[in-house]
């Protein structure tokens, strides 16, 4: 929830989420997040007409204006070396535990600048895997870069940028 809210620019900081409550429901789980009035207004203006999407970053939007959003430019930072990228790519598959057992999960990983994998988040939906990683990063800010096991679409880049994950 935290990563989705940050990646979708619903909140500008993890501190804007006061409380998260998860309850069993008839057909799954219900998640309630307590946020400020300003955040609630932002959420209402970005409302989508579907619950629990597992994939498409544009699915469920109600108007074309919701496709683009203002994204603050990231501060200039060093890029990972080719050696670091090669190391992370080589090591990523071995760290994808869910994918190894199901052959049906995407991964988003956080790597340090040397290409060492620091965190792995997996999900059937590539956007969800990235949301999970963004949520983890909001609690564990470190230098590094994101690597995903699937294509990095416009929506995924736009999701990672507000979290400061431009590397």
Predicted features along the sequence, with ranges:
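Intrinsically disordered, low-complexity regions enriched in acidic/Ser/Thr/Pro/Gln residues
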Residues: 1-108, 113, 119-120
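Short, flexible, solvent-exposed loop/turn segments with mixed acidic/basic and small polar residues
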Residues: 22, 158-159
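Glycine- and Gly-Pro-enriched alpha-helical subdomains that act as flexible
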Residues: 98-150, 162
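Acidic, divalent-metal-coordinating active-site segment for phosphoryl/phosphodiester hydrolysis
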Residues: 153-157
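A conserved acidic, glycine/proline-rich C-terminal tail/linker
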Residues: 163-167
């Amino acid at each position: 929830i935290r990563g989705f809210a940050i990646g979708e620019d619903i909140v500008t900081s993890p501190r804007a989420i006061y409380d998260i409550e998860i309850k069993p429901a008839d057909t799954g789980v219900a998640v309630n997040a307590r946020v400020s009035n300003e955040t609630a207004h932002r959420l209402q203006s970005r409302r989508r007409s579907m619950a629990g999407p597992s994939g498409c970053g544009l699915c469920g939007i109600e108007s074309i204006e919701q496709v683009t959003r203002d994204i603050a430019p990231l501060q200039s930072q060093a890029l990972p070396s080719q050696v670091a990228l090669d190391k992370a790519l080589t090591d990523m598959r071995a760290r994808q535990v869910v994918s190894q057992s199901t052959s049906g999960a995407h991964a988003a990983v956080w790597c340090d600048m040397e290409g060492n994998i620091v965190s792995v988040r997996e999900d059937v939906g590539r956007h969800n895997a990235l949301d999970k990683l963004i949520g983890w990063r909001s609690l564990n800010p470190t230098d590094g870069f994101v690597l995903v096991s699937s294509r990095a679409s416009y929506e995924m880049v736009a999701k990672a940028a507000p979290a400061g994950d431009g590397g």
